Amino acid sequence: MKKNRRIVMPLLVFILVIGGWELYVRVFDISLYILPSPSKIISALIENFDVLMQHSLVTLEESILGLLISTFLAILISICMDLSKTFKTSIYPYLIVTQTVPIMVLGPLFSIWFGFDLLPKVLIVIFMCFFPIAISFTDALSQVSEKEINLLKSFGANLFQIYKIVKIPSGAIGLFSGLKVAATYCVGGAIVGEWLSSRAGLGYYMLRVKNGYMLDKVFACVLMIIFWSILLNLGVTLLEKILFPHLRKGERK
């Protein structure tokens, strides 16, 4: 019964919002360039699907590449911080400071320094995705039981074996929690980069149709962005279940 309610209630709210939106636009005859109706947005999505997919491929390349690089860097830095308290004390404050810098300030600088091709967009994605992964994984590594580590040491385990047997599997839940957040950020990061400097991508396409006051196409583009963000998040969840199936099962128990 509770499961049905969890599905039915959000679905009901969705139907009411979309229905009310459609009714409002039709009754008050709102212009397309001010607020398109949901039916117009769906029509624009279907009619421009091929174009949207072409731009999606560009955005996905930037997003996935940035996410992979930021994950690698976050894992590396997190392990270094876990190994050395001095290193953590030295670098942790700067990780916090990076999150206070507006991405709209860095974007133009990256474009000036690195041009208008793939690199500046990937750097923006890395900048947005690195922090949640690094912080979540670092915190998870620091919470590993000392008893388990000491037990392995008593059996003669070296540092590599301790990380392989205990620390990485135990810290994986933090790593994937950060990855799920980053997976939703990465598409947004690529879009911001494309707004600032690009020749293709969903951000570039959105800016172009927005300047032409084609708001139905703007909303269609937003739907594509939401779709890819959710898909990447689900991909990370699936990867977690494949690599560490015990994690969520252990939580439920």
Locate predicted features:
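Generic hydrophobic transmembrane alpha-helix motif, especially the helices
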Residues: I96-P132, D139-A140
